[in-house]
């Protein structure tokens, strides 16, 4: 169009001006605000080395331009308006949203909504699998019509937190005409942190916000062909699920596929996340998941008058072990599956420094998930060639654009979860949960204090709000060969799981009939509760189950799951060496 509208690739201009702008954060090269047009006919697929010329070019001229603008004849260069080489600003990463025009016109631009960079180009030879080792073969950007980095909504209200409000998980309640219904009411959750650099409690809860972002607006219940098989029942859809099924413009989760079938690797919290709401019930119903499940823990902490501070994964990534070191005891949520490299380093250092850590989930510290270096509201997850996963990245595209390092499982980078938290992800199944029985180590003098008030032969956790038991959904095991510390005590072990509870596929090398089986046959299908001491009077306690916290409130909070966790926390908060 012969006007002042911007030149778009992978889309067409519908309206020249929208009043929405990009600047700052991951658009740091935008020195002044850049107004965006409203676009249509957005493109799905890769684009590599686009060129714009004043005339139609011959085959030989096109091939010459593809090899590089600088190597063209002066006559051909004079005909070229723009020659964008998407690999031109690859360094050790390609997190930049800036695209470079290599001509003297310098018609540089920006990518909008963070399509995937570091992707194999038209000339990829497969000689290198890492984009920054041979950047000229990684000149493609993969565009999707459902990419989103920021909804760019206007701010409707702000809230200045009064000093008297304690740290915790809160929500802004929004209603239409004061009505309470799923159609007229919404809750927007947020965290109030302690004052920067300070604590208001000896106990810290790290909200696994990375995992919330990874699962944000997931549509497995409506899109996945295995949803019913995973759950052993027909998924129960909420109003939010049905709405998201019709409105894909809110963006997808890293368990989703783009409309062209490729996996979703980038997730942002700068948009409405309808399944991260306190009243949302996951399609795995009657189970809760992520934020909703973690509210079982905060509810229990308040019931037990255990004061606690709350921070997020993002805070841990930014502040590191210095933040953890301010606390006598640190708790995880029920499903801290997604971790950055800095988060793992902080947890490992905290334990070595004498920190006392309680890992309250399963499938923790499993996937590499890195923050955008210029905007921590956005994470990237490349699902590699192994792991229990919803999709697999294409060959040559396993490395993160955001940091240039190998994506996928932390195990594939030599950081198996058991080296961090003593346990490794072993099984998953979403029909019903089970229970634990005590092991001999639980009666040793070093460990018996954790079970004060619990009988020697008492069944532990055969009740609960998540699948009906404390051992369910996803399970972790004690395994010395996989990195569980040799000084770890095996306190309890789950049993009686169904055949829908299956061993994780990264440990299955050959599919052999009758060898692996489900919970009634496979000894690897179990949750192991462990405890061990770390240097400088530190320690770790972990029950090894995702559904554990769902059992805390049973019988008006008077039950053996509640007693065990309360004993562990109060014991960890005491000054001096542990028994």
Language-model features, listed with the residues they occupy:
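Short, aromatic- and glycine-rich surface loops/edge beta-strands on solvent-exposed regions
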Residues: 168-174
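Helical hinge/lid and interdomain linker segments adjacent to catalytic or ligand-binding clefts
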Residues: 146-147, 158-160, 164-166, 177, ...
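Short secondary-structure boundary/capping segments
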Residues: 1, 66-67, 100-101, 219-223, ...
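Structural motif
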Residues: 204, 328-333, 540-542
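Extracellular glycan-associated modules
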Residues: 1-117
